[in-house]
Amino acid sequence: GIAVAYALAILDSSEIAHPPIEAVFTVDEEVGMLGAAAIDVSDLKGKLLLNVDSEDEGIFTVSCAGGATATCILPYNKDMINAKIIEMRLDGFTGGHSGAEIHKERANSNCVLGRILLNVFENIDMRIIGVNGGEKDNAIANLSEAAIAVLPECVDRAKEIINKVFDEVKDEYKVTDPAMKITLNVMDSQLVEAMSGPSTLA
């Protein structure tokens, strides 16, 4: 809002000296830069873009920044296997805004989940059933979930690896994320559809 008012005030004034100005106003930026993605810039002539933004009242940040959203579609194969299911939930992370708080070096629950899954996969026969890491583009994730399938005889080893890696991470981020925790739920053996071994690795 302040940037809109600022630009309109300059354009309306006959006393403020300035070069030619093109004011661009878009909407739906906090939910995914939708306005910026849809705008037709072919009529714009300016060579310098200024963005007025800030997270703190009374402070102007005059800059230019951009963002990119990548959509990755990975084909994968599924198998029906008889296995136990380990559900894991990582939460209690501090999280935050990826623009305003990225410099605070907080843990990202999605990155931690990936680290855990990789370690389990490297040590036992594990298949991914599903993962969920949230939907926000501009967030340092604070909650992640996954379900994996493992052979009954590998459950204890899997839990040992999961807890070991999580303890390492918790120690690394003990200052920024003191409340992070992991919850494991082991379900009885059953016939379950899960990613194939190569697809899990990918």
Question: What is each of the regions a protein language model found here?
Answer:
Residues G1-N77, R127-I129:
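Acidic/histidine-rich catalytic neighborhood of metal-dependent amide-processing enzymes
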Residues M33-I39, F60-A65, A100-H103, A141-L143, ...:
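Short acidic, glycine/serine/threonine-rich loops at helix termini
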Residues K78-I85, A139-A141:
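Flexible, low-complexity linker/loop segments at domain and module junctions
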Residues N110-A202:
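Metal-dependent amide/peptide-bond hydrolase catalytic core
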Residues T26, D53, P75, D91, ...:
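Solvent-exposed residues in well-ordered beta-strands and their adjoining turns
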Residues A70-I73, K84-G92:
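Short amphipathic
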Residues G1-E30, I86-L90, H97, K104-V120:
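Alpha-helical metal-binding/catalytic segments enriched in His/Glu/Asp
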